[in-house]
Amino acid sequence: MREQDFLNHFLKKGYFKKHAKAVLALSGGLDSMFLFKVLSTYQKELEIELILAHVNHKQRIESDWEEKELRKLAAEAELPIYISNFSGEFSEARARNFRYDFFQEVMKKTGATALVTAHHADDQVETILMRLIRGTRLRYLSGIKEKQVVGEIEIIRPFLHFQKKDFPSIFHFEDTSNQENHYFRNRIRNSYLPELEKENPRFRDAILGIGNEILDYDLAIAELSNNIDVENLQQLFSYSESTQRVLLQTYLNRFPDLNLTKAQFAEVQQILKSKSQYRHPIKNGYELIKEYQQFQICKISPQADEKEDELVLHYQNQVAYQGYLFSFGLPLEGELIQQIPVSRETSIHIRHRKTGDVLIQNGHRKKLRRLFIDLKIPMEKRNSALIIEQFGEIVSILGIATNNLSKKTKNDIMNTVLYIEKIDR
């Protein structure tokens, strides 16, 4: 194939339409060197600014020499190159994580929004077969994604439709360790695939076909279930067990860096069915929050070391606090003004709940913890609820409950009003 054919494919797919700067992961192998040649030659046509990034894994004697040659190559092409050296105990997983962490650092430093890798169809076959042997979930058998958004960056794999044999023989570095069967991927490439191709010469095409078919099913299910609110458990549980599993898995597809194992997926299912309220860290910085008939999966938010100080409000004063306007003894106009009887004799304290808080109702003291459970108040709302306190006792839990003192006591003590208006809607 000609370089022009690859360029035409890139333009037709519109890989770089949304990107002005792209980082190329340059290993020095045939695939990445040819991708470098195409991208550097046709930067203007693709309308991108190319940046190179290389990781020296320090696993071979030749790696330092290769690093120097890549520096020369970048200088000749007048392109910036960033290089990092791997250290510590080597494994495929550690090396992969190190590479992607480094690439993200380079992107942040340069303002690039796309990471380009030279994965091709042969890599795709190996990946699908590896996952199948390891017993991965069905959705992961669709293989490597051609385009994948992770956070604020997009990973682009423009060679995924081409086999290695489609690339011309150009200057590159041969990694001799690829011939050794120490690593799983090498055993797949050097031993398992050749044996399977003896049974079916078109085995690679068959594997790619299965991957594409699974991807089609995933996309179709996502489209058909678009109007189903999976986070509403009443709605989710109205379907059969099989449909629930498929809908839940489709929902999890929204989080590309949350790759749950079968055991972790089963654990999530169990929590949704058995817990009324639960907060559970899952994986990769995500947590599951279950609140009665609703749940959500989100990134774990950093918690402040210290809670906000309580607010003290004096008579004949107003203050805006956490989305509300509080007016002590000064009437507010409007249809949605809350009014709470209070005393003018002392200041009002507005705060969040504390351990041991109680509210007097019908002459009985009730712990807030028990009150929240009885009223089925979600955990998030419990933590954000505003407590209005006077004379050392809770007068009201805003929007939830009020201290219902007897009429006689109210007439004696409650001689003014705290007016409250929601101002952050």
UniProtKB/Swiss-Prot annotation:
Taxonomic superkingdom: Bacteria
Catalysed conversion reaction: cytidine(34) in tRNA(Ile2) + L-lysine + ATP = lysidine(34) in tRNA(Ile2) + AMP + diphosphate + H(+)
An individual GO BP term: tRNA modification
One GO MF term: tRNA(Ile)-lysidine synthase activity
EC numbers, comma separated: 6.3.4.19
Keyword match Nucleotide-binding: yes
SMART domains attached to this UniProt entry: TilS_C
Keywords: ATP-binding, Cytoplasm, Ligase, Nucleotide-binding, tRNA processing
Chain sites annotated for binding ATP: S27, G28, G29, L30, D31, S32
Entry's Gene Ontology cellular component terms: cytoplasm
Record family assignment: Belongs to the tRNA(Ile)-lysidine synthase family.
Domain notes: The N-terminal region contains the highly conserved SGGXDS motif, predicted to be a P-loop motif involved in ATP binding.
Function: Ligates lysine onto the cytidine present at position 34 of the AUA codon-specific tRNA(Ile) that contains the anticodon CAU, in an ATP-dependent manner. Cytidine is converted to lysidine, thus changing the amino acid specificity of the tRNA from methionine to isoleucine.
Protein name per its UniProtKB record: tRNA(Ile)-lysidine synthase
Annotated organism of origin: Streptococcus pneumoniae (strain CGSP14)
The encoding gene: tilS
